[in-house]
A protein has these predicted regions:
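Transmembrane alpha-helices and adjacent helix-loop boundaries
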Residues: 1-201
Length: 201
């Protein structure tokens, strides 16, 4: 469980950071930023995470000459995959801001970065928080795919136990319960946050 949590938390931090950058780039009027950002989102949303994990683990070292451990290959793949979804959350939040606020920022002489950090992002944070929390729940669930390249997370651990005791029904049922215990508080918190902020928007 600790490896699953470590993998998920690292992917959360990296995907949030990269997703914010990509989301802002997608809304940029500069084609050199918006075009690659849009393709980045499409590529990682329109290909299976499992394929991305396998490709980064087996193919990326061939291209770059750098070997990644199974853990870090999974972390990178999960971070890149989820950052595409985070980028869309940020983009949707940015689009939802009243255009009059942006125009007012221009009149005040604020540049694009200042408008984002001082006017837009503070307003949309409340709207983005529930889907971002849900995003972490998705990361926890998807982390099980890391077992395909040998990361010793929950699913891989259970598979090893089953090879010794041949009790798949009991072990996979326990595994499902463990994931439920991990994910339910996150999902419940996201729903509560959504209701809380909905009353204040």
């Amino acid at each position: 469980a600790l490896i699953t949590l470590e993998l998920s938390l690292l992917a959360l931090v990296f995907s949030m950071s990269l997703g914010l950058f990509v989301g802002i780039a997608r809304q940029s009027k500069r084609y050199i930023l918006s075009f690659p950002a849009s393709w980045y989102v499409e590529i990682f949303r329109d290909t299976p995470l499992l394929i991305q994990i396998v490709w980064i683990y087996y193919c990326l070292p061939i291209l770059l000459g750098v070997t990644l451990t199974a853990f870090w290959a999974s972390t990178v793949a999960l971070s890149l995959h989820m950052s595409a979804y985070v980028a869309e959350i940020f983009r949707a939040g940015i689009v939802s801001v009243d255009k009059g606020h942006v125009d007012a920022a221009k009149i005040l002489g604020l540049n694009y970065f200042q408008t984002m950090t001082r006017i837009i992002l503070p307003q949309v944070f409340r709207r983005m928080l529930p889907p971002l929390v849900n995003n972490f729940a998705d990361i926890l669930k998807l982390s099980a795919l890391a077992s395909v390249i040998g990361v010793y997370e929950l699913l891989h651990s259970v598979d090893n136990v089953i090879m010794n005791n041949f009790r798949p029904l009991e072990m996979y049922s326990v595994l499902a319960l463990v994931y439920f215990v991990l994910i339910f508080p996150v999902a419940f918190g996201a729903r509560r946050a959504e209701l809380y902020f909905a009353r204040r928007i």
